[in-house]
């Protein structure tokens, strides 16, 4: 048996370089590179291996460990989970910084390989710099915190353990039903220790991503439900995107006259102009989808997790006879809501079910309802995009601090409303541009208002809704699709939380366009707070008032364009729609990353449409407005499913 003496880290690099995936007969390299921020716990181990021979892996220099891991997640997502960039860090704080990104990847079922350094396996120098010591268990390190947020976790305490650890890591990373974050913890001494690794460990491995078909019994059980239903609705989830099942879903829906509601993850799997596509569904959904969903007697969930935002906390479907049918690779997700399930690939299952329903001559009983719902939403879209600031202006959101809007207007001299800005942006940028989002009020506006005609052009992280994802993910999406314009759309709150990978985008000459909506606060949480009877507390960006000792002083102005200019970006400030349009046009011409600081009036985002969100309200309060909000919530909850 032939073997080669190598360090653990050298063997890891060689192994990663030989991983491939095959999908629908197309073979592709799986691991394209490694993000890293070197520290003492990784630089002389894995760092030495990469310096000696990176093979065909590209090394990227991150600026923040969470940021680089978000970029890697977005790279994998934009590649439909068939390409990854691994992430390595030092021990302690560097590793801990990646925990949030690990959770983000796992919630969204996106493959993310994390390689954090760890304290010494021998324990000889304990406590090493940045090591946590727990008196009840010396085996615990910072890296144990990855366990709850990863789909696979391992620690390589001996060089020979690397083999089983990495084979299992690849098993999970390439499994569409189980994928998510994988953490392989690398003690810093073990990284440099050597072993006679067998050559067969380094052979080219092609991980086949297959299209399993549900068993026949499941199909016929679901068929018997569907054929007796008159008003079904399909929920298009992220599984449709990753299965590349958009065409199959469109044909299925149009053949049987079944309307489609999109989740955040499923959006852009099919065209917005598709006659059956009603658009976003649920809490952040639009009027068309939610009105149709309310009366549906059957919900067909395709590749969806049925999150609370999709089901409006299980209150959206009000027909007492409603039943649920699912197509999902994951039996766990397929079984939710007491669904009759088909456990398998979305495309294969849709095509097989299509043939079965065709034999039954099935057609839904909808007449003009689908078309009328789409027309009504088009009219609402026109209204939203044409909302302008004028005398006696009343913003969309009614629950608010009355003074905030005029104070912000006076401070910035802006007249831009959030919905009109989004309408203009959609009009100005190319159809095949990729937009990236994650948090705040913008995902709701985008799910409702953004129309997609180009496949996979809508990149939204709304499983973990992680503030700070947007810019790093914009960079990751650009790495995945360098020929397209990428726009990271985010609020000032999210920008302030994390924007470090802007520097990496400049370093790599990968242009990202940042559309920063500045309304001087955490706008959507302020809406949630005040709409439930609570006061305006710590959700606007205000100075501490020396007289009241509270955060109710004046608004804090920030010149985001000026700050970003210092990083080397081409920047703009927009205070009216003409300035915004000119900035968008000029930004397209630039070769370097850009930032448009869009000053948007508070409370001018969209509101909900026929939906409710279950949040944990106070049962008792001295404020009658809070008590009233709780009573209303309790009333709605009575009509929602219990599980």
UniProtKB/Swiss-Prot annotation:
Residues that span the membrane, as ranges: none
Q: What is its EC number?
A: 3.7.1.22
Q: Which UniProt keywords apply?
A: Hydrolase, Magnesium, Metal-binding, NAD, Thiamine pyrophosphate
Q: How does the cofactor bind to this protein, according to its record?
A: Binds 1 Mg(2+) ion per subunit.
| Reaction equation(s) it catalyzes | 3D-3,5/4-trihydroxycyclohexane-1,2-dione + H2O = 5-deoxy-D-glucuronate + H(+)
Q: Which CDD domains match?
A: TPP_IolD (cd02003), TPP_PYR_POX_like (cd07035)
Q: What does the record give as its pathway?
A: Polyol metabolism; myo-inositol degradation into acetyl-CoA; acetyl-CoA from myo-inositol: step 3/7
Give the region (Thiamine pyrophosphate binding) as residue ranges.
441-521
Functionally, this protein is described as follows: Involved in the cleavage of the C1-C2 bond of 3D-(3,5/4)-trihydroxycyclohexane-1,2-dione (THcHDO) to yield 5-deoxy-glucuronate (5DG).
Fetch the HAMAP family from UniProt.
IolD (MF_01669)
Its family remark reads:
Belongs to the TPP enzyme family.
Q: What is this protein called?
A: 3D-(3,5/4)-trihydroxycyclohexane-1,2-dione hydrolase
Q: Which organism is it from?
A: Clostridium botulinum (strain Alaska E43 / Type E3)
Classification of source organism? Bacteria, Bacillati, Bacillota, Clostridia, Eubacteriales
């Amino acid at each position: 048996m032939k073997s080669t003496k190598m360090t653990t880290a050298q063997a890891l690099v060689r192994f990663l370089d030989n991983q491939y995936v095959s999908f629908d007969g197309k073979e592709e390299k799986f691991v394209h590179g490694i993000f890293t921020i070197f520290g003492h716990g990784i630089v002389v181990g894995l760092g030495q291996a990469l310096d000696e021979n990176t093979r065909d892996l590209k090394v990227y220099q991150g600026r923040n460990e969470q940021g680089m891991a978000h970029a890697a997640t977005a790279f994998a997502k934009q590649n439909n989970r068939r390409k990854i960039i691994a992430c390595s860090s030092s021990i302690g704080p560097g590793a801990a910084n990646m925990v949030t990104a690990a959770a983000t990847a796992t919630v969204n079922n996106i493959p993310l390989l994390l390689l954090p350094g760890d304290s010494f396996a021998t324990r000889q120098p304990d406590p090493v710099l940045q090591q946590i010591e727990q008196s009840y268990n010396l085996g615990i390190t910072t890296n144990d915190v990855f366990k709850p947020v990863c789909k696979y976790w391992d620690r390589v305490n001996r060089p020979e353990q690397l083999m089983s650890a990495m084979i299992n890591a690849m098993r999970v990373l390439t499994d569409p039903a189980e994928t998510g974050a994988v953490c392989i913890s690398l003690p810093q001494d073990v990284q440099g220790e050597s072993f006679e690794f067998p050559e067969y460990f380094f052979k080219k491995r092609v991980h086949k991503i297959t299209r399993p078909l549900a068993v026949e019994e499941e199909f016929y059980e679901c068929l018997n439900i569907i054929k007796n239903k008159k008003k079904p609705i399909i929920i298009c989830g992220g599984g449709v995107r990753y299965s590349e099942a958009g065409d199959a879903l469109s044909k299925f829906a149009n053949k049987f006259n079944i309307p489609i509601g999109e989740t955040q993850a499923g959006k852009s799997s099919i065209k917005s102009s598709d006659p059956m596509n009603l658009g976003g569904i649920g809490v952040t959904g639009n009027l068309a989808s939610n009105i149709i969903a309310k009366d549906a007697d059957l919900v067909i969930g395709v590749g969806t997790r049925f999150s609370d935002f999709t089901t409006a906390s299980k209150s959206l479907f009000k027909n007492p006879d409603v039943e649920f049918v699912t197509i999902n690779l994951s039996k766990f997700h397929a079984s939710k809501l007491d669904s009759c399930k088909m456990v398998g690939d979305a495309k294969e299952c849709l095509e097989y079910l299509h043939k079965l329903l065709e034999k039954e001559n099935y057609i839904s009983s909808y007449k003009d309802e689908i078309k009328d719902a789409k027309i009504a939403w088009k009219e609402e879209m026109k209204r939203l995009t044409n909302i302008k600031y004028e005398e006696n202006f009343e913003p969309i959101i009614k629950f608010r601090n009355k003074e905030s809007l005029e104070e912000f207007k006076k401070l910035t001299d802006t007249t831009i409303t959030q919905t009109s800005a989004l309408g203009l942006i959609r009009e100005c940028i190319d159809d095949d541009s990729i937009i990236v989002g994650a948090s705040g009020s913008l995902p709701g506006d985008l799910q409702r208002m953004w129309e997609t005609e180009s496949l996979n052009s809508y990149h939204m992280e709304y499983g973990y809704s992680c503030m700070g994802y947007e810019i790093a993910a914009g960079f990751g999406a650009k790495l995945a699709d360098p020929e397209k314009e990428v726009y990271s759309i985010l609020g000032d709150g999210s920008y302030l939380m994390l924007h470090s990978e802007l520097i990496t985008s400049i370093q790599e000459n990968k242009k990202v366009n940042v559309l920063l909506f500045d309304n001087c606060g955490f706008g959507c949480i302020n809406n949630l707070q005040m709409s439930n009877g609570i006061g305006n507390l710590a959700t606007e960006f205000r100075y501490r008032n020396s007289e009241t000792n509270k955060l109710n002083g004046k608004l804090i102005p920030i010149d985001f364009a000026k700050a970003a200019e210092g990083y080397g970006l081409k920047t703009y400030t927009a205070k009216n729609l003409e300035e915004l349009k000119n900035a968008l046009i000029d930004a397209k011409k630039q070769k370097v990353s850009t930032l448009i600081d869009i000053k948007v009036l508070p409370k001018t985002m969209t509101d909900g449409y026929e939906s409710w969100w279950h949040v944990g309200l106070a049962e008792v309060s001295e404020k009658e407005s809070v008590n009233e909000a709780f009573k209303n919530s309790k009333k709605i909850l009575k009509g929602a499913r219990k599980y």
